[in-house]
Amino acid sequence: MPRIVSVKAREVLDSRGEPTVEVEVELEDGTVGRAMVPSGASTGTYEALELRDGDDRYGGKGVRRAVRNVEEIIAPEIEGLDATAQPDIDRTMIELDGTENKSHLGANAILGVSLAVARAAAKSLGIPLYRYLGGPTARRLPVPFMNVINGGEHAGNELDFQEHMIVPHGFESFSEALRAGVETYHVLGELLEEEYGPIATNVGDEGGYAPPMKDTVEPLDVLVEAIEEAGYAPGKEIALALDAAASEFYDEDSGTYRAYGQKYTRDELIDVYKDLVSQYPIVSIEDPLHEEDFRGFAKITEELGDKVQIVGDDLFVTNPDRLRKGIEMGAANALLLKVNQIGTLTEAVEAGELALQHGYGVMVSHRSGDTEDPFIADLAVALGCGQIKTGAPARSSRTAKYNRLLRIEEDLAGAAEFGPRNDFFLP
């Protein structure tokens, strides 16, 4: 098997114009694998630590320390190792770091190497990345969850819920679903401009529009209208989904949620979600409650989990240990999988497989500060989870993933499948 001969890193820019880490891994046969690391805006407390320089460069957000850690600490330890021994390489880096949250070397340093190694190994073997990661049975293309109206930490408007998504699921192929989502997105832009003027079509971090809306139902109403205007059936063909990112509007002092000009207890907020689900074709709600509230997640899952997908993002942070706790308590029924939350490919895949084994849905996700690297597109197909969240069909950091999935579907030809692995939540 091809061995690693060199590991290099550099500071590059993400989609927000902030520094991130890019890693190149070269193998003895001349193959080079390259990977770029994404970065989040609303981050869970228990995420692996992204190492920043904290100096005058880039407002303190430079990543030269992480780059040095790759080249001076990690590289000497993994050069000479078999590139296909992904778990061993990731374990070596975890042990080198020696902390629970990868704060010594930086999760951005470790993850860059982890992903670049996988890509180099796949190229060396002459097989697509999704096939290398998922084996010969990897053929399921994911339903795209498109964040077309941005709020919260992703936009400069007054919407407290962070993401309002369209979910084109009622189609025979990924390419058909993508087309329906794109057409709806553009109709939505026209409707928003008519109602609010050109300012409404400014976009947020993830390519979605950021209109000057103020309440919970306004974005949902216009999404349903856009779906219909685009010629599709709300619910049956294109559903809706929310990412509340509730930790961002939770007040720890009072133990309440402050959203849309009101104060809610946990039970009152759950009632808000129940009302929305009864009125709109919503199939998935992400982070409806605070990231520490496992009992609250169990309660909302018990009350709504037979109707919609309750997704844990900040709750689980792609951490197998936190996921096990959630499974034991019945908290949520789906995992949002972000590779940079945990910091290695091996641990992320472990979390995804653990969720699927216990009947949880899995949605592979980008970050708000992403790059043109489409790694997660291959990962979603490899896991066969049938769900991906990678923003609106705008900005190259988002469309890169959609375009990669189109190529994968073409590569699979007649063998390609489309749709969620766990489809209980779809109407």
Curated annotation (Swiss-Prot):
Binding site for (2R)-2-phosphoglycerate: Q162, K338, R367, S368, K389
Compartments where located: Cytoplasm; Secreted; Cell surface
Catalytic activity: (2R)-2-phosphoglycerate = phosphoenolpyruvate + H2O
PROSITE patterns per UniProt: ENOLASE
Alphabetical UniProt keywords: Cytoplasm, Glycolysis, Lyase, Magnesium, Metal-binding, Secreted
Active site location: E206 (proton donor), K338 (proton acceptor)
EC number: 4.2.1.11
One GO location term (cellular component): cell surface
GO biological process: glycolytic process
Pfam family, one: Enolase_N
Cofactor binding annotation: Binds a second Mg(2+) ion via substrate during catalysis.
Pathway recorded for this protein: Carbohydrate degradation; glycolysis; pyruvate from D-glyceraldehyde 3-phosphate: step 4/5
Cofactor field: Mg(2+)
GO molecular function, one term: magnesium ion binding
Protein purpose: Catalyzes the reversible conversion of 2-phosphoglycerate (2-PG) into phosphoenolpyruvate (PEP). It is essential for the degradation of carbohydrates via glycolysis.
The family this protein is said to belong to: Belongs to the enolase family.
Stated name of the protein: Enolase
Organism expressing this protein natively: Methanopyrus kandleri (strain AV19 / DSM 6324 / JCM 9639 / NBRC 100938)
Gene it is expressed from: eno
